[in-house]
Amino acid sequence: MDLFEYQAKELFAKHNVPTTPGRVTDTAEGARAIATEIGHPVMVKAQVKIGGRGKAGGVKYAATPDDAYEHANNILGLDIKGHVVKKLLVAEASDIAEEYYISFLLDRANRTYLAMCSVEGGMEIEEVAATKPDRLAKVPVDAAKGVDLAFARSIAEQGHLPAEVLDAAAVTISKLWDLFVGEDATLVEVNPLVRTPDDQILALDGKVTLDANADFRHPDHVEFEDRAATDPLELKAKEHDLNYVKLDGQVGIIGNGAGLVMSTLDVVAYAGEKHGGVKPANFLDIGGGASAEVMAAGLDVVLGDSQVKSVFVNVFGGITSCDAVATGIVKALEILGAEANKPLVVRLDGNNVEEGRRILTDANHPLVTLVPTMDEAADKAAELASA
């Protein structure tokens, strides 16, 4: 889960990472009030989960509260690379002597953690890596040893930070590591990390990505979810622990196992070419347990999409046998009742497939069409969606 800058700074404050005071608002009047409260010039910053805010006019310096009001009026509603600005961070402006870069991230290729540090802060790190690779240090981090002050100082040295800031930078770097580990993050980035004229080290901008798989350890992380920007069907699926991604199509997809569901998307897209360009409407993996409750929840989510014209249920029975899946489908249709109002094409294969097919045949539900092969089922689902 990617965080907004203001949320990242809330975690900075929690872990004692020094930054500038500020608050978030969604109105221009709120921006003026915050600037008045701070009592110094401020930065008015668009809160979007995308880079390039400054170039798009989403970050402005305000010398007075009235300036903050004017800038906020101009920034709210601004479209930055497809992201509409709905919130602003109004933070105290800081004098800057130098700008640096520091981040911790997962190095998936080498199965370790990585610290990245550079004296060339305030610019895109990809640009630094491309044009000045010798100025960007990439330091592997042993998770068992962590990042103490001595190692943090070494990271700063390798990033070519000046000698006079090494001790202060080391303290901040070690705290950023504590945040990275303590919050189960996959990325913690500060760009720029600045030195002020009086030699303070401040994190002026922050980016944090949290590992959603660790949410069970962090019930407070639910506060960071941007529910207003999340598709309501995806929210409903998450409540039932279903892996759902909405797509722009007409054939709802329900399957067990990510690989099978991905293959189902492909065969439906291929079949749809013969039926007016019909496409998959979603990715939905119900996992290994296709109980009646899970199947009902999955159907409820898929049928809640007004674009869906038909549903393709594609299940390979393994640990969960096909008869259990078939029973789940029948009971799910009973649970949903009139809400289940679109045709279902069902393909079963694998463990106890004959019994599963018998259960669906005996149920004789008017919405259910049982098809033996994946290709035939995809074609039938596409045909029904195009009707």
UniProtKB/Swiss-Prot annotation:
A GO CC term assigned to this protein in UniProt: succinate-CoA ligase complex
Enzyme class: ligase
Domain ATP-grasp: 9-236
Parts of the chain that traverse the membrane: none
Keyword check for Glycoprotein: no
Pathway named in the protein's UniProt entry: Carbohydrate metabolism; tricarboxylic acid cycle; succinate from succinyl-CoA (ligase route): step 1/1
Domain of life where this protein originates: Bacteria
Catalyses which reaction(s): succinate + ATP + CoA = succinyl-CoA + ADP + phosphate; GTP + succinate + CoA = succinyl-CoA + GDP + phosphate
Binding of ATP, residues: 45, 52-54, 94, 99
EC number: 6.2.1.5
Keywords: ATP-binding, Ligase, Magnesium, Metal-binding, Nucleotide-binding, Tricarboxylic acid cycle
Residues the record lists as binding substrate: 256, 318-320
Gene Ontology biological process: succinyl-CoA metabolic process; tricarboxylic acid cycle
Gene3D superfamilies found in the cross-reference section: ATP-grasp fold, A domain, ATP-grasp fold, B domain, Succinyl-CoA synthetase domains
Residues given in the record as Mg(2+) binding sites: 191, 205
Cofactor(s), names only, from the UniProt record: Mg(2+)
Signal peptide: none
GO MF entry, a single one: ATP binding
Cofactor note as given: Binds 1 Mg(2+) ion per subunit.
Matching InterPro entries: ATP-grasp (IPR011761), ATP-grasp_succ-CoA_synth-type (IPR013650), ATP_grasp_subdomain_1 (IPR013815), Succ-CoA_synthase_bsu_CS (IPR017866), SUCC_ACL_C (IPR005811), Succ_CoA_ligase-like_bsu (IPR005809), Succinyl-CoA_synth-like (IPR016102)
Function: Succinyl-CoA synthetase functions in the citric acid cycle (TCA), coupling the hydrolysis of succinyl-CoA to the synthesis of either ATP or GTP and thus represents the only step of substrate-level phosphorylation in the TCA. The beta subunit provides nucleotide specificity of the enzyme and binds the substrate succinate, while the binding sites for coenzyme A and phosphate are found in the alpha subunit.
Subunit: Heterotetramer of two alpha and two beta subunits.
HAMAP family found in the cross-reference section: Succ_CoA_beta
NCBIfam families named in the record: PRK00696.1, sucCoAbeta
The family this protein is said to belong to: Belongs to the succinate/malate CoA ligase beta subunit family.
Protein name: Succinate--CoA ligase [ADP-forming] subunit beta
Organism, as annotated: Mycobacterium marinum (strain ATCC BAA-535 / M)
